[in-house]
Amino acid sequence: MAGRSGDSDEELLKAVRLIKFLYQSNPPPNPEGTRQARRNRRRRWRERQRQIHSISERILSTYLGRSAEPVPLQLPPLERLTLDCNEDCGTSGTQGVGSPQILVESPTILESGAKE
């Protein structure tokens, strides 16, 4: 892991092994039995998965020293956001999706109070 010290890598690997063990200790439920029994087993399994997920987040935040959730990105106001399609549109297999469109303003739609 680039830019990290070896000791930090060992701590992170230890945390990942622990999380992997937690998930492996909760295998998917057995598909046998009555519908109600299967439903109850799935419900209990999902609850254990949620608990393992929250424990895993706490382990990672402890070992990494930060939250597992990304910090929210501050965006400018919506009025200032624009889509600029002058820079090589459709390079990732989406030809035609990002083609520029011309906005024709209709006074009947934009001016709700005006009647013709």
Curated annotation (Swiss-Prot):
Residues 23-49 are annotated as: Disordered. A motif (Nuclear export signal and binding to XPO1) lies at residues 73-84. GO terms for biological process: mRNA transport; protein localization to nucleoplasm; viral process. InterPro entries: REV_protein. Residues 18-26 are annotated as: Homomultimerization. The modification Phosphoserine is found at S5, S8, S92, S99. HAMAP family: REV_HIV1. Homomultimer; when bound to the RRE. Multimeric assembly is essential for activity and may involve XPO1. Binds to human KPNB1, XPO1, TNPO1, RANBP5 and IPO7. Interacts with the viral Integrase. Interacts with human KHDRBS1. Interacts with human NAP1; this interaction decreases Rev multimerization and stimulates its activity. Interacts with human DEAD-box helicases DDX3 and DDX24; these interactions may serve for viral RNA export to the cytoplasm and packaging, respectively. The RNA-binding motif binds to the RRE, a 240 bp stem-and-loop structure present in incompletely spliced viral pre-mRNAs. This region also contains the NLS which mediates nuclear localization via KPNB1 binding and, when the N-terminal sequence is present, nucleolar targeting. These overlapping functions prevent Rev bound to RRE from undesirable return to the nucleus. When Rev binds the RRE, the NLS becomes masked while the NES remains accessible. The leucine-rich NES mediates binding to human XPO1. This is Protein Rev. It comes from Human immunodeficiency virus type 1 group M subtype B (isolate PCV12) (HIV-1).
